[in-house]
């Protein structure tokens, strides 16, 4: 099967998608969209893309000339290599779904979560999404929340599947060696580590996490906060510097999701993920599989998947007092998740091999019906 994925060039999770298609007759292509304002680090992630053919493209949502150039370049690659499916991850790239579909390409659209959850009040986005949904061959997403948000924006209710992102539990598990991350970044062995794996942007409420640094350091001065994001945020960085917290904050740039991230989770006493909206956050699942004490905001994606105070900790959105209390209780040792139960729960429902089978089934169905003009 010949498959091409299209999403942000700095996507930390594209490798797991490529892993779905590692059989001898599979070939994976990656159209890596790079924001124009970040051309200085254009090739940063390339060293991590060993199992796919990468085409890096500059993307500017307002530059139609560039969008047309990108489309023709991708179409040339698709036609030359007989790519059977183009899987577009994140509706931010819906325009390419429209253009490639009009050129006869089999396009799958993937609702990424916030892209559809937060788009409801933008008329231009709604129209673009509606057209893309109408032309594509199928829609996938990782949660019921994202699926319903997409349907409200025009996604069809048929050929519309929920497929969890999936994680490789042979990589993310309780046997990951401890101390590797701390040693690499010269963090004392007995230090506490609080890790935020989310992008440094307001949606992820990074400011609320920063608010906890001072009070935590007052009681636990040997604590380090680690932020992982390819995208820098000068506002947050300046605030941390002005408040004299630099010596207790570590910024990580692009991190290989499978070669490096497991060691960060394993050495983290706490992993925090408290965005305003979310769908099915794989960083949360990975951290849980590695035995981390994970704190999440009370969003609909959780549903009945996990139990509060057992596999993870749930705090009310924007309740900074509750967040701080959770952190303090964990650092004091008064509370701790059941790592074994958390890992087993993840393995049973979220191992990537389960997702692989589901996605292959959808692709195969579309390829077999490739002579149909539309499926909807």
Language model feature labels by segment:
Residues 136-160, 167-171:
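A short, active-site helix/loop in glycosyltransferases that binds the activated sugar's phosphate group
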Residues 237-255:
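Nucleotide-activated donor-binding/catalytic signature segment of Leloir-type glycosyltransferases, i.e.
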Residues 88-94:
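Short His-centered aromatic/hydrophobic patch
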Residues 276-277:
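Aromatic "clamp/platform" in nucleotide-sugar-dependent glycosyltransferases that forms part
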Residues 187-204, 210-213, 226:
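Conserved donor-binding/catalytic core segment of Leloir-type glycosyltransferases
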Residues 36-37, 167, 197, 224-237, ...:
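Glycosyltransferase donor-sugar binding loop
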Residues 263-268:
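Short alpha-helical donor nucleotide-sugar binding micro-motif in glycosyltransferases
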Residues 293-296, 303:
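Short hydrophobic beta-strand element within catalytic cores of glycosyltransferases
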């Amino acid at each position: 099967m010949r498959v091409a994925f299209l999403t942000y060039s700095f996507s930390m999770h594209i490798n797991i998608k490529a892993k779905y298609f590692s059989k001898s007759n599979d070939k994976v292509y990656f159209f890596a969209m790079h924001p124009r304002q970040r051309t200085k680090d254009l090739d940063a992630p390339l060293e991590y893309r060993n199992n796919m053919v990468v085409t890096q493209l500059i993307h500017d949502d307002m530059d139609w000339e560039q969008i047309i150039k990108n489309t023709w370049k991708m179409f040339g690659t698709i036609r030359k290599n007989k790519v059977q499916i183009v899987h577009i991850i994140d509706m931010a790239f819906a325009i390419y779904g429209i253009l490639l579909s009009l050129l006869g390409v089999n396009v799958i659209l993937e609702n990424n979560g916030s892209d559809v959850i937060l788009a409801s009040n933008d008329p231009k986005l709604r129209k673009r999404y509606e057209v893309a949904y109408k032309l594509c061959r199928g829609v996938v997403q990782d949660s019921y929340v994202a699926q319903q948000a997409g349907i409200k924006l025009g996604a069809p209710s048929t050929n519309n599947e929920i497929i969890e992102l999936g994680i490789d539990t042979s990589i993310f598990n309780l046997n990951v060696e401890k101390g590797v991350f701390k040693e690499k970044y010269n963090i004392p062995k007995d230090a506490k580590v609080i890790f935020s794996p989310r992008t440094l942007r307001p949606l992820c409420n990074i400011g609320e996490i920063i608010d906890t640094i001072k009070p935590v350091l007052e009681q636990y001065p040997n604590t380090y906060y680690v932020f992982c994001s390819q995208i820098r945020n000068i506002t947050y960085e300046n605030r941390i510097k002005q408040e004299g917290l630099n010596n207790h904050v570590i910024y990580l740039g692009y991190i290989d999701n499978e070669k490096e991230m497991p060691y960060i989770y394993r050495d983290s006493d706490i992993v925090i993920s408290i965005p305003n909206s979310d769908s099915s956050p794989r960083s949360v699942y990975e951290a849980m599989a590695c035995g981390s004490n994970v704190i999440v905001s009370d969003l609909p994606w959780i549903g009945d998947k996990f139990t509060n105070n057992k596999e993870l900790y749930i705090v009310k959105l924007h309740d900074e007092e509750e967040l701080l209390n959770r952190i303090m209780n964990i650092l004091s040792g008064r509370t701790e998740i059941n790592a074994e139960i958390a890992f087993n729960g993840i393995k049973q429902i979220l191992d990537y091999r389960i997702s692989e089978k589901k996605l292959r089934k959808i692709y195969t169905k579309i390829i077999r019906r490739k002579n149909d003009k539309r499926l909807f």
